[in-house]
């Protein structure tokens, strides 16, 4: 019988889908395909690191279901993934999250049974991380998973995401375009694919209003899920061939178009990735090349945000 023993066994093995109408209208010479991470059980790429960080901590004897209180700072999707895994395994979970994150994120976290503590939006992810550290130090039997520093984050992308992309493209991938939050996805995938195909290039996407990877200063922006305002420990910048900065307006516009012209409902960071992918696909040197862009999350948790507001 083909029956998963629990929900976490359904994480990964997400499909690729080719974009048709948008690249045609934009005059793209390269092919753009999307890795639909929104088809994971809790609807984001973070499901992968959620299960791997918890599994590794269990294997190392650091945490135990029913005894350990898990704590994590999150912009939303990692929190949702951890809440799903914690519910399935029997952990209590406290999440710290900037108050600027969407209402749907908050509702989903509570639906899974997680406790949520909001931090000032002006402090960004830095304030969120500091509060999580305070809780981890003050509460009994608490353990902080630390997605920004945890090697289990890029590891799962080396073991799963990279190989899925390689196999599903028959090794034909030329470019990966991925937004950088923790940097785990681009680090894990690029580290594997660069060994398999030396000509492969990894392109990082960041907010133009917080261009830290490009050497700029951190700042407030509307692209939830990327642009943490610092360079995370798990991000290997040496694997990045190019950084493309995207405006809030571009991310919103392309996120909307993806839903309306391709039928793919996604979050704002997917819109940012698409904006960058189109720039790469339009370059004459990239004619007939294959670009794989990551869809980090499904769009239902963004319906209250500027991405899907004021639609006609």
UniProtKB/Swiss-Prot annotation:
Pathway(s) this gene product operates in, as recorded in its UniProt entry: Amino-acid biosynthesis; L-cysteine biosynthesis; L-cysteine from L-serine: step 2/2
Keywords of the record: Amino-acid biosynthesis, Cysteine biosynthesis, Pyridoxal phosphate, Transferase
Top-level taxon: Bacteria
EC number(s) stated in the UniProt entry for this protein: 2.5.1.47
Cofactor(s) needed: pyridoxal 5'-phosphate
PTM annotation (N6-(pyridoxal phosphate)lysine): residues: 46
InterPro entries noted in UniProt: Cys_synth (IPR005856), Cys_Synth/Cystath_Beta-Synth (IPR050214), CysK (IPR005859), P-phosphate_BS (IPR001216), TrpB-like_PALP (IPR001926), TrpB-like_PALP_sf (IPR036052)
Binding, pyridoxal 5'-phosphate: 77, 181-185, 269
Class of this enzyme: transferase
GO biological process per UniProt: cysteine biosynthetic process from serine
Gene Ontology MF annotations: cysteine synthase activity; L-cysteine desulfhydrase activity
Record's catalysed reaction(s): O-acetyl-L-serine + hydrogen sulfide = L-cysteine + acetate
Cellular compartments per GO CC: cytoplasm
Family per record: Belongs to the cysteine synthase/cystathionine beta-synthase family.
UniProt xrefs under PANTHER family: CYSTATHIONINE BETA-SYNTHASE (PTHR10314)
Protein name in the entry: Cysteine synthase
Gene designation: cysK
